[in-house]
């Protein structure tokens, strides 16, 4: 946003340099990115009156001009501009003067004729071509009215000015207007803010007799209003208005269009002006566009619309694309006599979608996208009518035609001085706090110690108590807040929370096993959003994704981990082991916030041990992956259970479901060969666990176990069981019958093949017995061991 200091003084006048003002504004949180000084590098620039023009005798494209500069004698200037003519009032750089770019003006002879100065175009005095009025793009600037010769040209053009360029954050849309900025400056300097003139001399004719309005999509257009103005005289706008627009980065067109743009910058409220006679009916109907409906916009482009677009129609055909751009056949032209001035509130999301899809970003659409101040909608329309009456000789019809409700102009928020003081760290009185809010234009009252602040609709960045506290600190001045040391009743040393400690343990365990931590995108493509998801839940899609590949919130960490491994393998890094701790997202239906759950996932491919001097290479496999997961559980003092399962995307015979305390929390498995091949991977193993579920289990401290004082006894058994029986089932039976002397169990061999019936397998298990209080006897061990064997037999196991 470009803020002219000369324009700002219409609303608030502070006795400060622009540099001091910019520094103060920056300290309150609105960054002034640059100060544009239109007087910089310019010297001896005056208004000249062209008394005569004669052709140059030695050059076809040059003219010899006698120019009155307000001095005793006119000066002779040779000029090559095609539009120079006798009687004009022009910009002249005198001899000894300077122009931007280091141009020095000297006496010279051009094709034998002396020239004592230079008649200038706007571009030559530092005005950008893209904002220069079209009729002066390729020639000198001509004042529309007589100006006294010798007058400072910068003063006559309202360029004796400095312009602040704001770098605004998206939440400060209120500063996208001169009045919004004036409220801010008035609060900073505790001075009065002056509002512009609004009242017109209305005729006795009523606009309601000429126009009706109907809105069929009130959810998208909660308020729509219009006023009618007759007998408009189309012409150039006054010089002061043209150059305020130029300094704001907008090209002047004519008085009607310029007034619309001027009010946009003044109030931050976009307006649209229709040629009333070209609308084609006496009614305006606002609705959603029909799918594949078309209209031609002001830029001459034929636009194909969607049913998500808002259109303004004459009851039948679109005459404007609501909040984005008008239609070409109802635009204001030199033949326009009667004008309809529109002011409305449009749904920000709809405007954003339409403007981005059609690539029609404008000053208007950008303001609608951020949300506009309801308090200014009707004011802005009235201001435009006043300016049309004043500068276009128009007649304003009485009455406003409107549809819908503007709603409340304020949002009340309750706060206390104690809350403010505890937050900012020093004490202000109720009166001081209320005074700050009143300076900002917030109506405030004190009720029994509670400060009720009525926040105006222009400040959409303020919605909670903390926002109000920020305003107090900003306006009081961050630099003026006294420095104080914090006071603590009890001082304690910092320490990790339980979750932080566990997370550090998990990371150390995984990294000790050779895995590297990865951090991947939370967004995946829609096609992969539910890959590997244990829960059948709805997905959450972005309304405006950066790309299709990042359009949906993930329900698993594995899709991007697979991408990361594939990326590495494609670049000859074939031994990759990664883990990630991150959030996944499960939908709860439209309008509800999703559930965010933290997951722990890992992926391994290639060789786990690949250095030849260490011996035989050891490729990663299912049991290695399972061992890493079990090691994590052991470090957290958790007991995981495993059972065979099926997960889409994993090998049907090499997948296990992981459960904790009877609840499924994840899985381990080998990537399905087809999926691995699609990613150019060899055998690849993954795991994914509900990390939140792991963290929720309270296990207390992991106690130290002393070295046993008495010797233990080990017994090995081999069991022939059906193929579908798992080792965990056997171990469970063993532990149930091992009484208090069974210390540990270990599966050390699994065999399938010759010497066994089809559908059978042999599992070898080592049982360790230990009595921490006494020496074990054979009788005691045999009794417990036999009990275990009998229990195994009852469950179908054959002792080999």
Swiss-Prot record:
Domain of life: Bacteria
Cellular component terms (Gene Ontology): phenylalanine-tRNA ligase complex
CDD domains according to UniProt: PheRS_beta_core, tRNA_bind_bactPheRS
Gene3D superfamilies named in the record: 3.30.56.10, Bira Bifunctional Protein, Domain 2, Ferrodoxin-fold anticodon-binding domain, Nucleic acid-binding proteins, Phenylalanyl-trna Synthetase, Chain B, domain 3
SMART domains: B3_4, B5, FDX-ACB
Required cofactor(s): Mg(2+)
Annotated cofactor note: Binds 2 magnesium ions per tetramer.
Compartment(s) where it occurs, according to its Swiss-Prot or TrEMBL record: Cytoplasm
PROSITE patterns: B5, FDX_ACB, TRBD
Glycoprotein listed as a keyword: no
Keywords: Aminoacyl-tRNA synthetase, ATP-binding, Cytoplasm, Ligase, Magnesium, Metal-binding, Nucleotide-binding, Protein biosynthesis, RNA-binding, tRNA-binding
Domain tRNA-binding: 39-154
Residues binding Mg(2+), per UniProt: 461, 467, 470-471
GO biological process, one term: phenylalanyl-tRNA aminoacylation
Catalyzed reactions per annotation: tRNA(Phe) + L-phenylalanine + ATP = L-phenylalanyl-tRNA(Phe) + AMP + diphosphate + H(+)
Recorded GO MF terms: ATP binding; catalytic activity, acting on a protein; magnesium ion binding; phenylalanine-tRNA ligase activity; transferase activity; tRNA binding
Residue ranges annotated for the B5 domain, each copy included: 408-483
Assembly and interaction partners: Tetramer of two alpha and two beta subunits.
Family membership: Belongs to the phenylalanyl-tRNA synthetase beta subunit family. Type 1 subfamily.
This protein's name: Phenylalanine--tRNA ligase beta subunit
Biological source species: Staphylococcus epidermidis (strain ATCC 35984 / DSM 28319 / BCRC 17069 / CCUG 31568 / BM 3577 / RP62A)
